[in-house]
UniProtKB/Swiss-Prot annotation:
<dbReference type="Pfam" id="PF00651">
    <property type="entry name" value="BTB"/>
</dbReference>
<dbReference type="GO" id="GO:0097602">
    <property type="term" value="F:cullin family protein binding"/>
</dbReference>
<dbReference type="InterPro" id="IPR015915">
    <property type="entry name" value="Kelch-typ_b-propeller"/>
</dbReference>
<dbReference type="InterPro" id="IPR006652">
    <property type="entry name" value="Kelch_1"/>
</dbReference>
<keyword id="KW-0677">Repeat</keyword>
<feature type="modified residue" description="Phosphoserine">
    <location>
        <position position="10"/>
    </location>
</feature>
<keyword id="KW-0225">Disease variant</keyword>
<dbReference type="InterPro" id="IPR011705">
    <property type="entry name" value="BACK"/>
</dbReference>
<comment type="pathway">
    <text>Protein modification; protein ubiquitination.</text>
</comment>
<dbReference type="GO" id="GO:0005856">
    <property type="term" value="C:cytoskeleton"/>
</dbReference>
<keyword id="KW-0880">Kelch repeat</keyword>
<dbReference type="GO" id="GO:0003779">
    <property type="term" value="F:actin binding"/>
</dbReference>
<comment type="function">
    <text>Substrate-specific adapter of a BCR (BTB-CUL3-RBX1) E3 ubiquitin ligase complex that acts as a regulator of ion transport in the distal nephron. The BCR(KLHL3) complex acts by mediating ubiquitination and degradation of WNK1 and WNK4, two activators of Na-Cl cotransporter SLC12A3/NCC in distal convoluted tubule cells of kidney, thereby regulating NaCl reabsorption. The BCR(KLHL3) complex also mediates ubiquitination and degradation of WNK3.</text>
</comment>
<dbReference type="InterPro" id="IPR017096">
    <property type="entry name" value="BTB-kelch_protein"/>
</dbReference>
<feature type="modified residue" description="Phosphoserine">
    <location>
        <position position="376"/>
    </location>
</feature>
<dbReference type="GO" id="GO:0070936">
    <property type="term" value="P:protein K48-linked ubiquitination"/>
</dbReference>
<dbReference type="InterPro" id="IPR030578">
    <property type="entry name" value="KLHL3_BACK"/>
</dbReference>
Amino acid sequence: MEGESVKLSSQTLIQAGDDEKNQRTITVNPAHMGKAFKVMNELRSKQLLCDVMIVAEDVEIEAHRVVLAACSPYFCAMFTGDMSESKAKKIEIKDVDGQTLSKLIDYIYTAEIEVTEENVQVLLPAASLLQLMDVRQNCCDFLQSQLHPTNCLGIRAFADVHTCTDLLQQANAYAEQHFPEVMLGEEFLSLSLDQVCSLISSDKLTVSSEEKVFEAVISWINYEKETRLEHMAKLMEHVRLPLLPRDYLVQTVEEEALIKNNNTCKDFLIEAMKYHLLPLDQRLLIKNPRTKPRTPVSLPKVMIVVGGQAPKAIRSVECYDFEEDRWDQIAELPSRRCRAGVVFMAGHVYAVGGFNGSLRVRTVDVYDGVKDQWTSIASMQERRSTLGAAVLNDLLYAVGGFDGSTGLASVEAYSYKTNEWFFVAPMNTRRSSVGVGVVEGKLYAVGGYDGASRQCLSTVEQYNPATNEWIYVADMSTRRSGAGVGVLSGQLYATGGHDGPLVRKSVEVYDPGTNTWKQVADMNMCRRNAGVCAVNGLLYVVGGDDGSCNLASVEYYNPVTDKWTLLPTNMSTGRSYAGVAVIHKSL
């Protein structure tokens, strides 16, 4: 207001006007309330001026009615109404354990409470009973922050029971967005039929392929096969079989015993087969729930850059937020690691093998982005550095590399379902510093260094998991060891690398349909031993070295414009031989 000075403080303030006689002093002391409650709590601890005892189980708590009534509508109604408790000196609270009630009454006096994994499930309903809505909301916020593929369905059920509407929606959205990881957990396998149907029928389900939904149904049925077998048809009604590749329908769905033994399921399969026989324009005319593509909510992504040389092996891990154009440090590796294979699989980032500064290793560390934590899993059969790593059909492949004495042609695969490594067919050529990528169900090993001939390689091999065989495909136009290899729009990119002392900035692209390579625009900088990933239709090349120094810069390729652009912000550390993966941003 004009002519008035307003400031929230414990100072004396003056309202000035035309008439000096209208002066007045307003004192606002924000610490007053806190001091008053502190004194009241001290009185309570000494059992002074207390006029009520609150009892739960065998815990007795002395308190002041006016304080409880001022902070809790539950107590206010109790003490001001016509109930017998309004005058009782001792009041028993049922459905709340003594320790929890004590914490909540402490909160009433102090405005402080600690919410933990251990107490949140008893604290929230107790806070709801006492109508301490701030505590209830804090519990909901805590549970939301703890959402993880292994617990989101349990949190969803808890939120439903206690009518926590926002938390229920958040947990349900999380389950939909992380379905490939959620379906692997005990919580999913323990869902009721209606709960499974509700989840897999959602248009918002985030799956790279409808294969995941089919696998989830089979897993759920087999978990308690005798009692669940009768539900097979009802579940398959929600699997969008027409959207599956024809090869998968023939080789996997048709061969599944649970499908063969159910006539309704066979009808769904026939429907899908007929759909594939139709021309594309006629397919678009078919409108039913099983031919409708899912429309998941797009989750923001971040890029994880793991370890590397700077100039020695490091533990540092950096995270790039694409939306905010910002780099952050996240949890370090348990030990130094460079020249490792790094992939994203089943909701986690895997760092496979590599070099720790003194030894080539066969160890594997796994990063959980929700917990910001690394853990160790089963080690590979062989030590490998400068290997290639890729994911195909839910298996992590470790390809070639160097064991400290020789280049490797061997290849091994890891199943996260069994936590075991096993060998598959070896390549035809030993390859260290090899780049790998997966296109249309085939694994490609690109270039590298052949220790036997002591030459960098231009040859490329393709692995077919169905036949467990490697064959040569078209050579690149030039020899490349330490090339950054990535996949974009069904094509395989080989970026940079080196041939002896010559470090390249050229890039070429392989089309599996024509078995040919073609040149595209050069990068802005010569790079070898860089990390590569694809995000939102762009190919990112991260760090590496130019033959004389490690690079902190990142550039990306747009295939529409055939141009490379440098990111405006660099990593905090120049690093080569780092691994790169893309994960969903933890919200």
